[in-house]
Swiss-Prot record:
Swiss-Prot/TrEMBL catalytic activity: a (3S)-3-hydroxyacyl-CoA = a (2E)-enoyl-CoA + H2O; a 4-saturated-(3S)-3-hydroxyacyl-CoA = a (3E)-enoyl-CoA + H2O
Any one Gene Ontology BP term: phenylacetate catabolic process
NCBIfam families: PRK09674.1 (NF007239)
Native source organism of the sequence: Escherichia coli (strain K12)
Protein name in the entry: 2,3-dehydroadipyl-CoA hydratase
Amino acid sequence: MSELIVSRQQRVLLLTLNRPAARNALNNALLMQLVNELEAAATDTSISVCVITGNARFFAAGADLNEMAEKDLAATLNDTRPQLWARLQAFNKPLIAAVNGYALGAGCELALLCDVVVAGENARFGLPEITLGIMPGAGGTQRLIRSVGKSLASKMVLSGESITAQQAQQAGLVSDVFPSDLTLEYALQLASKMARHSPLALQAAKQALRQSQEVALQAGLAQERQLFTLLAATEDRHEGISAFLQKRTPDFKGR
């Protein structure tokens, strides 16, 4: 049985974490499969958006502790996981997390890495690494504080406490909360809506949004303007404006 189920709905790629016995713990093998699928999707012009989900009880409950327990300092220094996370971060198309149940530790970090997080009412988000004598190591401290602010992020990281889907939405980590049996359906609807837009515009807009968290305002504004200008030379820009003026649905080609 595959630990990552891959399916397609038109221009949307769906990746389902499938390690139920391990609560979808993100071991190196599963991370590598995620990386491979996303890197293939990045260059596949027939794919515009990707959705990552788990099961009804667990999005992903963290890293694989059995795998971690085997590593001493030397093994940790030579761990490939930082490179795998960097490759996930480099995905250039919209990435949506559809979260039901627990998103803890590395599972929460995976959700934070996504562009949009939608959650079921039963979802919980947390970084409990402190209870194990360690700390988040895959972007949790950096992305959580940018998402929910200093006070709540510090409380979660330093106490190990998790928050509900409703609290996550109020804090800005989650965009929408739904009955748990509708979470994936809504995420796929949102992905399909995004996928109707110009692939070039989607990628440029994602790049600009990401830059806003990584550079100073003036540098971000300059990058935004550069990307806006580059889109002016595309066929999709001409098609989008023409379709609007002619009151018809645009037919974007990604050119």
